[in-house]
Amino acid sequence: MSAIPAGLAIRFKRWEGNADLPVPAYATVGAAGFDLRAHVPDDAPIVLKPGARCMAPTGFSVAIPDGYEMQVRPRSGLALKNGVTVVNAPGTVDSDYRGQVCVLLINLGEEDFTIRRGDRIAQGVIAAAPQWPLVEVEDLDATERGAGGFGSTGV
C-alpha cells in the first residue's frame, strides 16, 4: 500500500435523503477504487436504453485535498456484462468542487439497463493532479516520433 501524506483524508458529505446508502468505500484491501452508488428514488429507477446516456447522482459531495483529483471510472463488471460504462472515462472531480458527485453513464449494450437505488455504478480513484506551469514557446524540442499519432507507431 502506498503512503498517504499525513493528515490527508477524503471527506464525503451526505446529501439529504440518502441515509440508507453507505458512504463510498473500498470493497477489498487491495482495491484501487472505491464504490460509487446510485442515489435515485426507490420508485423511480433510471432505465438506460441502448445508446442512451444519463447523469446518475451519488448522493454525496466530496472534499479532495489540493493537488489531487477524484477520477470517476467505469466498473469492469458493468461494462463486460451489460455494456454500461462511464461516458467521459475517467471523469474528473476537481479538489475545489463541492457539488453532488454525479456519474455520466452510457449504455453500449443491446438491452435496457435499469439503475436502482444503491446500485454500484462507478468507482472513484484518488490521483495526484499538480498544477504545472503552462508556458507558451516558439518551438518544441524534436523527438524521434515527432507529430506522428493515431496509430503511427503501429497497430
Swiss-Prot record:
Needed cofactors:
Mg(2+)
Sites where the protein binds substrate? R75, S76, G77, N88, T92, V93, D94
Keyword Magnesium in record: yes
* Keywords of this entry: Hydrolase, Magnesium, Metal-binding, Nucleotide metabolism
- Show the Pfam families listed in the entry: dUTPase
Question: Which residue ranges run through the membrane?
Answer: none
GO MF term set: dUTP diphosphatase activity; magnesium ion binding
On whether Glycoprotein is a keyword of this UniProt record, the answer is no
Classification via InterPro entries: dUTPase, dUTPase-like, dUTPase-like_sf, dUTPase_trimeric
What CDD domains would the database entry show? trimeric_dUTPase (cd07557)
Signal sequence extent: none
- SUPFAM superfamilies linked: dUTPase-like
Spell out the reaction equation it catalyses: dUTP + H2O = dUMP + diphosphate + H(+)
List, in alphabetical order, the GO biological process terms annotated in this UniProt record. Answer: dUMP biosynthetic process; dUTP catabolic process
Q: Which Gene3D superfamilies match?
A: 2.70.40.10
- Domain of life per record: Bacteria
Biological or metabolic pathway of the protein: Pyrimidine metabolism; dUMP biosynthesis; dUMP from dCTP (dUTP route): step 2/2
Q: Under which main EC class is this enzyme filed? A: hydrolase
EC number(s) stated in the UniProt entry for this protein: 3.6.1.23
Record's function text = This enzyme is involved in nucleotide metabolism: it produces dUMP, the immediate precursor of thymidine nucleotides and it decreases the intracellular concentration of dUTP so that uracil cannot be incorporated into DNA.
Q: Which family does it belong to?
A: Belongs to the dUTPase family.
Question: Which PANTHER family does the protein's record reference?
Answer: DEOXYURIDINE 5'-TRIPHOSPHATE NUCLEOTIDOHYDROLASE
Under the heading NCBIfam families, the entry gives: dut, PRK00601.1
Name of the protein? Deoxyuridine 5'-triphosphate nucleotidohydrolase
